[in-house]
């Protein structure tokens, strides 16, 4: 996938493995941490939980039973809001065909280039209370966007490598103009100077509140 080319996740996973961090003993290999799923139950002050930020819950190798456990926790700890972000919205849609999306679960998909705009339609087809797009890393102009049913859009460039593909300000501005026109909340990703130029004070008004 285009946005995965210089992703920080594999680099960080291997670094944490070298640092002997228990959760990363397998490096970048897919590992299910069942013992971590109940952590939100011990935090009683409500917050936003980014579920599996260094992975994809809807990866083909993640069993539905593991997703069921995650959904169980979201219901047991309804004082938190949980964000599920995927590059595989078709698998997300298939999963929720036979399951109700809890009101405190936000569903999102990554749209880093125009060729992936089809994911928006798939996300829109899922019955959920809150849906968002992550246009990060933004690798090109997305053109015209239909944001019907979308509640939030995050915009950011690639980060973490010397050979990062730069995001052009006009690409971010195109998204901001359309979110403003369609009444959709949008913000830039933390530390992205190009996006900050476009979004100014709107930077991370939502994302800064994450707990995990």
Language-model features: locations:
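A general structural detector for well-ordered alpha-helical segments in enzyme core domains, enriched
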Residues: 66-70, 119-123, 171-175
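Noncatalytic carbohydrate-binding groove/subsite architecture in carbohydrate-active enzymes
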Residues: 104-109, 117-133, 141-144
